[in-house]
Amino acid sequence: MSDRATTTASLTFESLYGTHHGWLKSWLTRKLQSAFDADDIAQDTFLRVMVSETLSTIRDPRSFLCTIAKRVMVDLFRRNALEKAYLEMLALMPEGGAPSPEERESQLETLQLLDSMLDGLNGKTREAFLLSQLDGLTYSEIAHKLGVSISSVKKYVAKAVEHCLLFRLEYGL
């Protein structure tokens, strides 16, 4: 049986990993031009597959793995961009006002959690929520800034709050 001909009837995690790990790592190395990042993303990809219950539904293992790996890459890029922005902000702080390494790590984890929590919200919903919660703007100010009605802002913020609550319930936060 060829790599691509792995059927769902015979597909186990072990066979998926054994057959496709090398290929996925090579594909990721070409995409990322970094064997180190490729190895991390390949491992995270297979970890996500292992904890999911989707093995029986996989029709094309390589396409499936590429889809998961692309999501992991997006998460990595977002996390790196968030960390870079945070470190740049810290560099602008006066020397005595910078948080300790432990506080920095905790703050960065909180930012990453918030980013994950807001993932999946559309642009205006996410923006309305952030303007309300982080910038402290009123619904009227947000409506003006976004060019929408106050009623729309209320719906956006309510949707974002619901999304965050469901996220917290799902992940036990």
From Swiss-Prot:
Gene from which the chain derives: fecI
Keyword Ribosomal protein among record annotations: no
Keywords: DNA-binding, Ion transport, Iron, Iron transport, Sigma factor, Transcription, Transcription regulation, Transport
Quaternary organization: Interacts with FecR (via cytoplasmic N-terminus).
Protein name (database record): Ferric citrate uptake sigma factor FecI
UniProt keyword annotation of Transcription regulation present: yes
MF terms (GO), sorted A to Z: bacterial-type RNA polymerase core enzyme binding; core promoter sequence-specific DNA binding; sigma factor activity
Organism: Escherichia coli (strain K12)
Motif annotated as Polymerase core binding, chain positions: 40-52
Record-linked Pfam families: Sigma70_r2 (PF04542), Sigma70_r4_2 (PF08281)
GO cellular component: cytosolic DNA-directed RNA polymerase complex
InterPro entries: RNA_pol_sigma-70-like, RNA_pol_sigma-70_dom, RNA_pol_sigma70_ECF_CS, RNA_pol_sigma70_r2, RNA_pol_sigma70_r4_t2, RNA_pol_sigma_r2, RNA_pol_sigma_r3/r4-like, WH-like_DNA-bd_sf
